[in-house]
Amino acid sequence: MNKKRILGAALALFTALSMSAATYTFKIAKPIEDMKLQIHWCTSGEKSDLEVQNGVATLSKNDFTAQYVRVYYGRAFAMDLYLEPDKDLTVDCNAEAREFNCTGAAATINNYLIKSPFAVLDFNAAAKEEADFIKSSDSVYNANLALMKSANLPAYFVNKEEQRLLFKSYVMFPLYKSYHPYMKKMDDYTPTALYMNKLKELAVMDGNFLGYAEYGDFIMNAVFCQAFQGGDSSQELMAFMDANVKDAKVKTYITNAYAYDVVSSSGLDGNDAIVAYFHKNVSDPKLVDKFDKVCKQWEGLKAGCISPSFTATDINGKQVSLESLKGKYVYIDVWATWCGPCRGELPYMTKLEEQYAGKDIHFVGLSCDSNKSAWEKRIQKGDMKGIQLYLGTKSDFMQKYLINGIPRFILLNREGKIIKADAPRPSEPNITMLFDELLKK
């Protein structure tokens, strides 16, 4: 950052601090008991949790430069706003009626943000051929620019909004590489130079744009699109980043997001390189502390550690413990009747069970359904093989395995020690190779 930019930022913050604090008020129809309203500050990365009292949440603040924020109220609503340290804002929120309205000094910009019918590229557009997909993407951006220009917005905001709209409009563009073959049922697809050149043109590496939440989503997927070539994802990403991502802020942002997601979902086994890469490229104390905490949680789930135990109920009411299954390998499927991806794995699981029938492997289904009768009804159909057990939702086993998404597969050895805390799914070809290797021992 050059001296002029540093001085400009310092002057902007000093000016903001010298003003009386603006007040931001959110009036919520039918508030949810004990639910806080959250404000995510896009430039600073801070979060403000506001108590909602009698349907009203209020924040007075001026220690910031004007920036976009994302406001969340549980699952009831989410919205993008633009807050300025010297302009009051009141937002009336009726989530049930989908009615939102702003009043106060900052009303013009924010009514535009929450009420405008922004153009969005439909998922089905990925079925188009590259040239038509690019035209559709360009049309979305042009439509959003026209909408902005018709809104009579202040000039100081227009420049920022035009940049934000670029990333908002093209946010689906980097996903075309993976969505197109899926939509067209293609076994193989390699984008042409037409698509890749357009992507590179859009994917400007500038950490200052991280003040737009849309840029973070866009640039991460743009980097993934260019980096991933079907090999080891982490190795491909690290190589691409070192060669092409020179902006330190962007590199930190993508490294942190990717490494945290990988470790929090699949643990430490096999991820030594990405953990080291994180510590090489991320120095923000808050990010490092958060990452180190999730790494520490996974330490007890590394290969060779004794597995957390469970006791669950079969369809006849019999209690079955993990300890009673020792002596064979144990392949656990944590699932629920309502889970679409879980149901998608069932045919593959059935084939796997048939292929390894009579072998030294227990196949165990652990249901985390909140509705036990739904599980019972599904099991009573009689088409699910293996050991089917009901675990329920508030399970110590699930908490210790850090399960925050299903299906989750776990593989244990004959002594009840962990082989893989996040094992391959039945639909993945490498699961049979893993089983065959283990059964030779």
Segments predicted by a language model, with ranges:
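Thiol/disulfide oxidoreductase modules built on the thioredoxin-like
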Residues: 382-384, 391-436
